[in-house]
Amino acid sequence: MGFAEAFLEHLWKNLQDPSNPAIIRQAAGNYIGSFLARAKFISLITVKPCLDLLVNWLHIYLNNQDSGTKAFCDVALHGPFYSACQAVFYTFVFRHKQLLSGNLKEGLQYPQSLNFERIVMSQLNPLKICLPSVVNFFAAITKMKTCGYGWW
């Protein structure tokens, strides 16, 4: 394992550990997103599994919220969730060309498998909380790549 992968693993452990303070978890999520999105030396072979981990964690988080009374938009309650959402959206914004490369139909299979629709349409409403610039770019890219408005 290289330094970059070890750093990502360290950040991932901090993000998903509920015993860590929320601010530490959120900072870890923010670093993951920035690192995956902007570090040119991070290959797609590393980016995809990290996105898979983040998105899977988001879906599990949503599963746990579906039956609860705290399933509403609140940064104080769900800060690490929103941080992970922004990490995913930010990474997708900067890596979408690589993630969608090749045949359009085949290229769309990967983002479809992530089920962004469930995340963005959830009661936690991450598009309301994440940075507007990230949300706007994410929405524009998903709209453009689907040839019309919609979430794969």
From Swiss-Prot:
Q: Which PANTHER family match?
A: RNA POLYMERASE I-SPECIFIC TRANSCRIPTION INITIATION FACTOR RRN3-RELATED, TRANSCRIPTION INITIATION FACTOR IA RRN3
InterPro entries per the record? RNA_pol_I_trans_ini_fac_RRN3
The name of this protein is Putative RRN3-like protein RRN3P1
One GO term of the biological process aspect: transcription initiation at RNA polymerase I promoter
Molecular function per GO: RNA polymerase I general transcription initiation factor activity
- Coiled-coil regions, chain positions: none
Q: Which family does it belong to?
A: Belongs to the RRN3 family.
Q: List the disulfide bonds.
A: none
State the superkingdom.
Answer: Eukaryota
